[in-house]
Amino acid sequence: MDTLRTLSETKRTFYTLHTRPLNSIYRRVIEELLVEMHLLTVNVDFQYDPIYALGVTTVFDTFMQGYQPEKDKESIFNAICKAVEGDPEKYRQDAQWVKSLCEQASGEAVTAWLCELKPLEVAGNLNQMLEGIRDNPRFKYSRLFIIGIYTLLETANPEIVNDDQQRETVLTNCCQALNLPKDKVDKDLDLYRSNLEKMEQARSVLEDVVRADRKQRERREQQQQNTDSELELEKKEENTEV
């Protein structure tokens, strides 16, 4: 019998793979995602699927916007996936593929697929996967899975998720079709949207601080240049007098 890896082992693997310091503003986002994925992947009822992968990449890409240095983001994502014994390239490819379905089919067709389980031709085996979720009483629901569903709905029909009444109707139908716990779905998506707003506000404040710091630095540099120019001019005048 295989021994399940512990959270400490997962974290240790992550920090072994990504050795650069984490930007303190984003540390909580990174570690919470790592812990969430760890707890899911060691659960006996958990099954990886492309919609879950889309949830993972959506959360990472959305909440890591503005991370500096930018070049570290790929290393962090790769380390998270590998720390939970996943393939980062597969996560990316599966997420991109399932999201591309929204471009290959109409918004109505995608919504009917997720909310009524009407087969979507371009979805291939995902049709059977959704039916399997519906029929599996032990399906391991997760916040990342519903964020993947929400991202598909938002991509296919942005006006629906932006309208409270339409969003409520669609999510209710989706939960009924897939046998998902509506109370958990509401709680997870409310928190997700709330965190998006907070992150956007924090990012805006950070951008203002960076912009103000840049202007102050440019002003100091200009003042220094002016001072240097004045000193140079004084030297020339002194030499001329001599």
Set out the residue ranges of the language-model regions.
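Short, recurring structural edge motifs at helix starts
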Residues: 37-46, 129-139
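Transmembrane alpha-helical segments and their cytosolic interface motifs
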Residues: 49, 118, 137-143
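Hydrophobic/aromatic-lined pockets within catalytic cores
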Residues: 61-64, 153-157
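Extended, low-complexity, amphipathic alpha-helical coiled-coil/linker regions that act as scaffolds
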Residues: 67-69, 141-145, 157-187, 191
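A structural feature that tracks compact, well-ordered secondary-structure segments
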Residues: 148-152
